[in-house]
Amino acid sequence: MKISNLDDWYEVTRGLYRYVIAAKVCYELHILYWEDGTDILAAKSSLYIVGDWTSIPEHTSFFSREILLAEQPVFECLKAAEKDYKENI
C-alpha cells in the first residue's frame, strides 16, 4: 500500500476517503468538487489528519480533525499526506 496512490485509500462514502496510519488515527481526503468525466486526481479536495489523541501534561483524551491542506487538487493532497507521514509518523 502506498499513501500516494488513491486506489490504496478506503472510500468511506462517495467523496470521502480514509487512509489509516495508526490505531485510531488516519488521513481523510474530502472531495469538494469533481466534475463528471474528469480525472479524480484533478478534483478539488481537502486533506485532514483525524484521530483520538491523548495530551500527556493535562491527562486528557480528545478527538480532533486538523486540516493539512485546503481546497487543492487530489494529487497535491496525496503528496501532502506522504510528506506529513514521512516527517511526523
Language model features with spans:
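Intrinsic low-complexity, intrinsically disordered segments enriched in polar/basic residues
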Residues: M1, I21, V25, Y33, ...
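Polar/charged side chains located within well-ordered beta-strands of beta-rich proteins
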Residues: R18-Y19, E28-H30, A43-S45, A81-D84
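Negatively charged, low-complexity tracts enriched in Asp/Glu with abundant Ser/Thr
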Residues: M1-C26
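Mixed-charge, Lys/Arg-enriched low-complexity segments
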Residues: I49-I89
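Short, intrinsically disordered, low-complexity terminal segments
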Residues: Y19-V20, D39-I40, I67, C77-L78
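Short aromatic-glycine-(Arg/Gly/Cys) micro-motifs in beta-strand/loop hairpins
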Residues: Y27-L29, E35-S64
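A structural detector for beta-sheet-dominated domains
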Residues: S4, H30-W34, A70
